[in-house]
Amino acid sequence: MVKCLLLSFLIIAIFIGVPTAKGDVNFDLSTATAKTYTKFIEDFRATLPFSHKVYDIPLLYSTISDSRRFILLDLTSYAYETISVAIDVTNVYVVAYRTRDVSYFFKESPPEAYNILFKGTRKITLPYTGNYENLQTAAHKIRENIDLGLPALSSAITTLFYYNAQSAPSALLVLIQTTAEAARFKYIERHVAKYVATNFKPNLAIISLENQWSALSKQIFLAQNQGGKFRNPVDLIKPTGERFQVTNVDSDVVKGNIKLLLNSRASTADENFITTMTLLGESVVN
C-alpha cells in the first residue's frame, strides 16, 4: 500500500513538474469579480508584515529576516495557467515569478531572492530591472499606453506563463500595477476593480501616485513631528491632467487611499531621513 502511494506521488510530481508550495495569496481570474479582486488585494495587504502604523497606515519593515522576506502570489488566467509571483515584503516590489519548472528574476533582484525562491527550478535572469523606466524601454511603450484591467491581467499571466520575450515587459508592467500598486493605493485598486470585463488606459492620477509612493511615504512619516504637515509638498496630477500639491496627512490622497508606507533605514525623523529608494522622475522601481 505504501509503495503504491509513493508511486502515485512520483507520477503526480513528474506530471506537474517541480513541486512548489502553494502561494500565500491566490487569485483565479477564471471566476473573478470586482469583489473577489478586492478581496485578493485586501488579503495581499494583510499578508505583508509591518512595524507599526503611522496615521493608521501600516509602515513596512525596512529589514526583515530572510525567511520572512518574500511572499508568493499565485495568479491563474482565464485559461487556467498559473504563475507564482514573488513579492519583497520590505517594499512590495515584484522580484521574480515562476511558471512550471522555470523561474524568472529581475536583473536587480536581491541575492537572497535567488537563494530562497523557487528552489529546484531553472533560474533565468531577465535582461532588465523592475524599474518602470527600464520596463517601458524594453516594452517600447509608456504605461499610459498599456491596457490595465482584469482581462489585461489574464493576458499578462498567459504571456508570462509561456514567456514571450517580446511581450514580457508589457505583461510585467500590467502585473505590477494590478497587484503591487493596487496594494499600495486604494484609488488604483478601485479603478482596476471597475474593469472586470473590459480594459482601460491608466490616467495621469494613477501614474503620478505610482511615481510618488516613496515621496508620500517619506512625508507622511516626517509629518509625525510636524503636526501632520509635510516638510516638503508632494506634486501629483489629477485625472484631468491638472497638477496639485499634497501638503498634509488630512488630504484625501492620504486618508483612505494610501494603504502601505515605504520604510527607511534612518533611526530618527530628521533631515537625514533616507528612503529605501530614490525617486528620479520616471525612474521608479515597481
Swiss-Prot record:
First-tier enzyme category under EC: hydrolase
Protein family according to the UniProt entry: Belongs to the ribosome-inactivating protein family. Type 1 RIP subfamily.
Keywords: Hydrolase, Plant defense, Protein synthesis inhibitor, Signal, Toxin
Reaction(s) this enzyme catalyzes, per UniProt: Endohydrolysis of the N-glycosidic bond at one specific adenosine on the 28S rRNA
GO BP annotation list: defense response; negative regulation of translation
Span of the signal peptide: 1-23
Matches recorded under InterPro entries: Ribosome-inact_prot_sf, Ribosome_inactivat_1/2, Ribosome_inactivat_prot, Ribosome_inactivat_prot_CS, Ribosome_inactivat_prot_sub1, Ribosome_inactivat_prot_sub2
Organism: Momordica balsamina (Bitter gourd)
UniProt name for this protein: Ribosome-inactivating protein momordin II
Residues the record marks as active site: 181
Keyword Hydrolase: yes
The keyword Plastid belongs to this UniProt entry's keyword annotation: no
